[in-house]
Amino acid sequence: MPIEKEILKEIAKVIDQTNIRKDASQDEIMETCEQAKEFGFRGVCVNPEWVRLANQQLIGTDVKVICLIDPPMGTSPHQLRIQEASRVKLEGADELDVVMNIVDLKYERYFNVLGDLKEICQILPTKVIIGSGYLTDTEVRKAAELAKASGAICVKTATEKDPLGHSELAEKAKHLKIMRESAPGLLIKAAGGIKSYADLLMMREAGADIIGTSHGVEIMRELKT
């Protein structure tokens, strides 16, 4: 049975429609933006080279331009991360989805992790990606705590296109609950492998406020039929 229009709008508003394929074309990015406008998605997440185009396509709408920074492990030098974040701000990004330096996290170099993220979070509202599929439960907890301490607005499980960095949905749901407990007051974003409304609902029930997916259109069409 089709879902009521107002409920569809509420569902769309939690979706960050994502196109971070390295081989994405200009036409495909434009199509992603048009889909976001059509369905009323929360935002469009793209790689840095497409921020200017996405901004041009979405100007005058409520759809946020979100830029992915430094996948898959967040290990680029700090100054390069700052430079890229600053550049995409000038090009029209509204938010950053920034990968935490997962190597520094694993080696417990927390001072480095926190210093890097604090500076980035001063540039634009930032979601911190922790690559939960690489982490133990204890590391997920610590990563979420660091994200909160950095001034981020949100902690996120993984990137859409990093198969090693995101876990199976059941494991992801467990991590979402840990993230919620460890970073009270922050938004929680689930991404990676979310392809259907059932997947979305599972993530929402586990505590996700935002859903990152390249399958937003398919999910919305599923609900309309």
Model-predicted segments: where are they?
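Conserved N-terminal beta1-alpha1 strand-loop-helix module at the mouth
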Residues: M1-L90, K142, L146-A149
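Hydrophobic faces of well-ordered beta-strands that scaffold small-molecule active sites
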Residues: I11-N19, V44-V46, K64-D70, D94-V98, ...
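Generic structural signal for well-ordered alpha-helices
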Residues: I29, C33, V51-R52, A85-S86, ...
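Alpha-helix-loop-beta-strand connector modules within alpha/beta enzyme cores
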Residues: P48, R52-M73, Y110-T136, A149-S150, ...
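Catalytic cores of alpha/beta
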Residues: N55, S76-L90, L135-L146, K174, ...
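Short secondary-structure transition/capping segments
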Residues: Q56-L58, H78-Q79, E108-F111, E139-R141, ...
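Glycine-rich phosphate-binding active-site loops on the catalytic face of alpha/beta enzymes
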Residues: C67-P72, L90-L105, S150-E168, G193-T225
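Conserved anion-binding
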Residues: L80, A85-S86, E95-L164
